[in-house]
Swiss-Prot record:
This protein is involved in the repair of mismatches in DNA. It is possible that it carries out the mismatch recognition step. This protein has a weak ATPase activity. Disulfide bonds: none annotated. The keyword Metal-binding does not apply. This is DNA mismatch repair protein MutS.
Amino acid sequence: MSDSVAPDVPVIREGKNPAQHRDRTTVDREALSPMMRHYVDLKDEYPQTILLYRMGDFYETFFEDACTIAQALELVLTSRQSGNEVGRVAMAGIPHHQLDRYSRLLVEKGFAVAICDQMEDPAQAQGLVKREVTRVITPGTLLEEGMLNARSNNFLAAFVLAGNHWGLAYADISTGEFLTTQFSERETLAQELLRLQPSEVLFPTDAPDIQQILRPGEQSDLLPEGLPNQFCYSLRSQTSFTQAEARQRIQEVYGVRSLEGLGCEHLPLAVRAAGGLLAYLEATQKDTHIPLQPLATYTLSQYLVLDHQSRRNLELTQTSRDGTFRGSLLWAIDRTRTAMGSRALRRWLLQPLLDLNDIQARQAAITELLPQTGFRKELQNQLQKIYDLERLAGRAGSGTANARDLVALAESLGQLTELSHKVAKCEAQYLQALQTVPPILDQLAQRLRAHLVESPPISLTEGGLIKPSVNPELDQMRQQIVSDQQWIANLEKDERERTGISTLKVGFNKAFGYFISISRAKADQAPDDYIRKQTLTNEERFITPELKEREARIFTAQTEQFQLEYDLFVTLRTEVGEQASLIRTVAAAVSAVDILVGLTEVAVYQGYCCPTMSDSREIQILDGRHPVVEQSLPPGFFVPNATELGSAPSAELTPHPDLVILTGPNASGKSCYLRQVGLIQLMAQIGSYVPAQSARLGICDRIFTRVGAVDDLATGQSTFMVEMNETANILNHASSKSLVLLDEIGRGTATFDGLAIAWSVAEHLAAVIQARTIFATHYHELNELASLVENVANYQVLVKELPDQIIFLHQVCPGGASRSYGIEAGRLAGLPPSVIKRAKQVMKQIEQHSKIAVGLRKGNTQPRARKSSAETEAKTQQFELPF
């Protein structure tokens, strides 16, 4: 791991005794104290981590790690004597009860954290306390609830490259999801990583035994070219990624002899990636068992393809402007009541369906729920009471769940039974999935409720976990403790009467245990059987043999009680862990129902319709609306618009073209309209109702958007070059089943160049690819394309012209705009009147004398016949440009 520190990290604050050593490599190890030598040896084993070393009530760090966390966490850097010949070494620590909090902060800053725990009671240790690293926490291996975002996955990914081919595996160890795939093209791998947004990415390198972590934004020659550097990359040696070792590890984890049943028998790169990921979990989780679901193999062709640019432009999970959740499509349609439902909805949005039957199955559930307002409310109330089953099961299976987790799990499993009763008569496939809850889960819930108290403490080692009457031995211990504590409670009264000292008190502290306190003034009245234990300024403290005997009995009984309660709890947790896979299977069904109930709520309150889906190329939307923008406006303010693309040509007044040239002034709503069409199509392909009066939609294989561009400073590319790269990607990957949404192609260069590029791109999309396309532009010269290519039509965003202003009507209708109203927009923005006047003069001259304008006025306007899709080579050469 790099030791570099961000510029905004505060300067280290130091304690009174400055450290003489801040680097472990500068000290004589033989001169170190035994404890410090053990620390240094462990640090050598985990050089790329922050080693948190348990010492009593603190986790301490030393040397360079102490300096690092003092800066990163804004802690005071202290020091510790570490041998007479060595002197003081740098030290910084955190309280043991705040381990999760500080570990999360370190992980968020890109550090890996090794947890070294005490493996025995220091009070009973012979010599140096036994300590071991019990877990390594990295960005991709989080289990603790406080470290995770409840509504998004925390993926650990691993990839393997072989020429132009790659294998990818990813897992969320908190939910158990584990998937793998294999494909070609480096750019496709980059796009898949950008879709997943993994917290950590593993990849093998040829460097022997390398273990290095690249924090987000760090550059390295070891990182393969073309991959985004915004992730945390963990470089691993090739050993665990070899075919033989990876295959063997997967077979051992799942107890299989062949990978055929997992779907990856003939995907060697996918197997290597999955095996390497499992090896990393073994290395970081130590003895912690991670209950992963069976490895699932998927292909990219199963889902509608959305590249990173399209996801960003459509603002699916965050806004492109400032990256916030509010204002995204997910914000607008997420009405889920469970954390796992919200995570699943995010996955649905990022992987829309291609299978018509799957889409219609989701629609059927919404259609069934739509008229049942009261029933939906009951389901939502029930769902609201269900905790995060996926992650609760994961913590139980890994042995990290506490008693509160199991109580939450018991309550949630109990709600499943209620849910199954409510959906008993439902007919939709997704609702029927919850009609039967495995009896073993109901039995497990009853067992948990019977054993655990309703509000248990967080600690598992201080008792208070198990209900009375569960275990006779435990009840007997508790009764003995109560009896002895009652004797001590009566002791104060009895001793006051026996000694005549009215101020006598019985007290307790951890250092001395129980004691009898008498003021200094009356200490000489203490009976002979009192044994002086401690002298303070205002009091004397005594003990008696019988008091110490009772104390020992209480201590022994409590120790045995706490251990027995812990053992009983661990048994319960193990039983839950054994059912983790089954619990997660049911959780997936709950998540789907949660999503569909939420989508129904949105459909009802926003007035959505059920789109008619087909395998055709038709996109016909009546009164479509932008699902996010309309929620940001007062009711009735959003102007709906129709869209017709991709159906067979006809002689109707409103043609159904493959490509629409959309013209209109700035701020008239063109970009909003483009996004609106894309979002409606995407929502339909996740099985949702859509914001329209009606819709007939053919399934798309890809949605491409190019709406706005900015300089790519990281690669030194200008706005125009970024635009051209994105456009090239669209032209190289779009098909006749794709939906392409383009805004202002060619605006980043000279007018002639820009118009030429825009014309040729539009022409290629319409004539060669025949993709369903909306092409928004300020080049109103492109309106001429509709007269040359039959499957192109002109549409415009209407404005109302007044003598001194223009009013945007936001209505899209047939016909091309002849003006862009740029000068009017400049006037509205506050340009000086003299500048506006001069601009009008120049515009008039350009319109009268421009070669482009003159050429277009003289050009051929006879429409050409639509060519067959097979004639791809010479199509564009047959068009005679009208200038």
